[in-house]
Amino acid sequence: MNSLENLILVGVIKSCHGIKGHVMLKSFTDPATKILERNLVNESGANIHIKLISQNAKGELICTFNDIATRNEAENLKGYKIFCLRASLPELEEDEFYIADLTHLPVLNQDHKEIGKIKNILNFGAGDIIEIEFSNQTTELLPFNKEFFPIITKDYVILNYQREA
């Protein structure tokens, strides 16, 4: 059994597709089909078997999933999270990070004072967006680039941004 610390979320089942038990898989890998090259597991560490049927224009994968054969079975999988073992992932370059490693990191200002935490990392197609939950419980979305985040470490990020009062 694997703890969630040893797992990296690489995809989620969005919906069923058709009547043969196919599922629509949203992959968080780049490219989307890279997910198929990994040994996939669920939260408990049990192996998952996925076979690609096709890919739509949005990059979502239409797949068979384990032994699911009917639409009714596939409908029950909506929101099902798919992981791979952290140890199976390739080494990253110096300025590269996995989303799972950035989420919940402390956000520091230029004076190295903690002002919040990374709540989420989003991507709507035009680049990564960081959602920050500030100490006063407000949230803001900021582009994930060197201008806003000049320093990123495994322990914290520095934010170069003056918030409006």
Swiss-Prot record:
Which Pfam families is this protein grouped with? PRC (PF05239), RimM (PF01782)
The positions making up the signal sequence are: none
SUPFAM superfamilies referenced in this protein's UniProt entry, alphabetically: PRC-barrel domain, Translation proteins
A GO cellular component annotated for this chain's UniProt record is: ribosome
Q: Which domain of life is it from?
A: Bacteria
Q: Does the keyword NAD apply?
A: no
Q: What does this protein do?
A: An accessory protein needed during the final step in the assembly of 30S ribosomal subunit, possibly for assembly of the head region. Essential for efficient processing of 16S rRNA. May be needed both before and after RbfA during the maturation of 16S rRNA. It has affinity for free ribosomal 30S subunits but not for 70S ribosomes.
What does the annotation say about its assembly with partners? Binds ribosomal protein uS19.
Q: Which family does it belong to?
A: Belongs to the RimM family.
Recorded protein name is Ribosome maturation factor RimM
Species source reads Rickettsia conorii (strain ATCC VR-613 / Malish 7)
Give the source lineage, highest ranks first.
Bacteria, Pseudomonadati, Pseudomonadota, Alphaproteobacteria, Rickettsiales
